[in-house]
């Protein structure tokens, strides 16, 4: 017989048959036999906490038998794709068994710890993003924040302020102010004094007094009633006339003394005229009072309503003479 290769005995393990220890996951998994051949072993442990796989006990028996693979495969040269796939399946099987051994509480604590570990990382990433900005970008962002309200203010300032006259035309007010009212009232009184008109009053015989004056219309408080018309004389002439009138008992006293611009004057209304101001009777609680009215720097004595006066009411004012001689001569001055 010629020279050649010796025939190998069946079942000696050289033709690629795997031993029982390799099938059952014995010690040959970590220490495989190396007889000059390349051996591929997979032992890396990867813990998948997010999606744990099912335990091999949950698989059906048929699937368990079909899933049995060899941990060790001897091949000459490069490993085939089938051996790689078988090694990956075996790794997943080992990982699933290890995960199933861990209790559920431990897995929950580990998941919580992972969540707590990931959350601050996200916050730090946001802070790191802000810190990672260059200084120029930071200044620009700050300027943008500061300029935003300023833009609003400028827009408000630029917006035109609408006035009431933009919608409604200007009309002259018919209302009169205080100065205008006083000026018109003065002009009216000046006209009445200069013309001698006496409106709203008349002479009336009063029981126990004689002649008197009553109102023929209503007067409001502060309204002009009538002028005490007479001769305007100085104090020296007034004293001389008063002495002469005192000699005649039939002559009454119609003299009124006052001061104007630090000068004493007297209005002598003793002479009988058609003016009604001289006929108004005396009363300490009268409804009228005297007031000086200037017309071209000439004082005039007028009577003004102290309160509202009704129609038919007698006009009265206080003569102001408190001298004893006058009271003795005219006792009605006491009232």
From Swiss-Prot:
S-adenosyl-L-methionine binds at residues 209-211, 254, 281-282. Protein-lysine N-methyltransferase that monomethylates both histones and non-histone proteins. Specifically monomethylates 'Lys-20' of histone H4 (H4K20me1). H4K20me1 is enriched during mitosis and represents a specific tag for epigenetic transcriptional repression. Mainly functions in euchromatin regions, thereby playing a central role in the silencing of euchromatic genes. Required for cell proliferation, probably by contributing to the maintenance of proper higher-order structure of DNA during mitosis. Involved in chromosome condensation and proper cytokinesis. Belongs to the class V-like SAM-binding methyltransferase superfamily. Histone-lysine methyltransferase family. PR/SET subfamily. PANTHER family: N-LYSINE METHYLTRANSFERASE KMT5A. Its main location: nucleus. Signal peptide: none annotated. Residues 1-91, 133-183 are annotated as: Disordered. Transmembrane segments: none annotated. One of its GO terms (cellular component) is nucleus. It is an enzyme of class 2 (transferase). One of its GO terms (biological process) is cell division. Keywords: Cell cycle, Cell division, Chromatin regulator, Chromosome, Methyltransferase, Mitosis, Nucleus, Repressor, S-adenosyl-L-methionine, Transcription, Transcription regulation, Transferase. It comes from Xenopus laevis. It catalyses: L-lysyl(20)-[histone H4] + S-adenosyl-L-methionine = N(6)-methyl-L-lysyl(20)-[histone H4] + S-adenosyl-L-homocysteine + H(+); L-lysyl-[protein] + S-adenosyl-L-methionine = N(6)-methyl-L-lysyl-[protein] + S-adenosyl-L-homocysteine + H(+). GO terms for molecular function: histone H4K20 methyltransferase activity; histone H4K20 monomethyltransferase activity; histone methyltransferase activity. Gene3D superfamilies: SET domain. Its EC number is 2.1.1.-, 2.1.1.361. This is N-lysine methyltransferase KMT5A-A. InterPro entries: KMT5A, KMT5A-like, KMT5A-like_SET, SET_dom, SET_dom_sf.
């Amino acid at each position: 017989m010629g020279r050649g290769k010796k025939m190998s005995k069946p079942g000696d393990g050289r033709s690629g048959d795997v031993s029982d220890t390799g099938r059952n996951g014995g010690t040959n998994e970590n220490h495989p036999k190396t007889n000059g051949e390349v051996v591929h072993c997979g032992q890396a442990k990867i813990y998948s906490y997010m999606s744990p796989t099912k335990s091999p006990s949950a698989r059906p028996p048929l699937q368990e038998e079909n899933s049995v693979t060899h941990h060790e495969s001897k091949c000459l040269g490069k490993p085939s794709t089938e051996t790689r796939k078988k090694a990956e399946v075996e790794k997943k099987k080992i990982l699933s068994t290890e995960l199933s051994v861990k209790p559920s509480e431990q897995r929950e604590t580990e998941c919580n710890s992972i969540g707590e570990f990931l959350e601050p990382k996200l916050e730090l990433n946001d802070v790191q993003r802000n810190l990672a900005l260059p200084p120029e970008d930071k200044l620009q962002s700050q300027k943008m924040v500061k300029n935003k309200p300023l833009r609003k203010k400028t827009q408000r300032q630029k917006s035109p302020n609408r006035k009431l006259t933009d919608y409604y035309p200007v009309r002259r007010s018919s209302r009169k102010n205080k100065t205008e009212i006083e000026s018109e009232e003065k002009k009216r009184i000046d006209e009445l004094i200069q013309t001698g008109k006496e409106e709203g009053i008349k002479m009336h015989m009063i029981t126990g007094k004689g002649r008197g004056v009553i109102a023929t219309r209503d007067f409001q408080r502060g309204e002009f009633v009538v002028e005490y018309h007479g001769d305007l004389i100085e104090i020296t002439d007034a004293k001389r006339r008063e002495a002469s009138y005192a000699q005649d008992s039939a002559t009454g006293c119609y003299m009124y003394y006052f001061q104007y611009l630090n000068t004493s004057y007297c209005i002598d209304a003793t002479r009988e005229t058609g003016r009604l101001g001289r006929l108004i009777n005396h009363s300490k609680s009268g409804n009228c009072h005297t007031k000086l009215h200037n017309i071209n720097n000439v004082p005039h004595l007028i009577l003004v309503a102290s309160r509202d006066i009704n129609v038919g009411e007698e006009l009265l004012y206080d003569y102001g003479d408190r001298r004893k001689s006058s009271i003795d001569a005219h006792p009605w001055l006491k009232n």
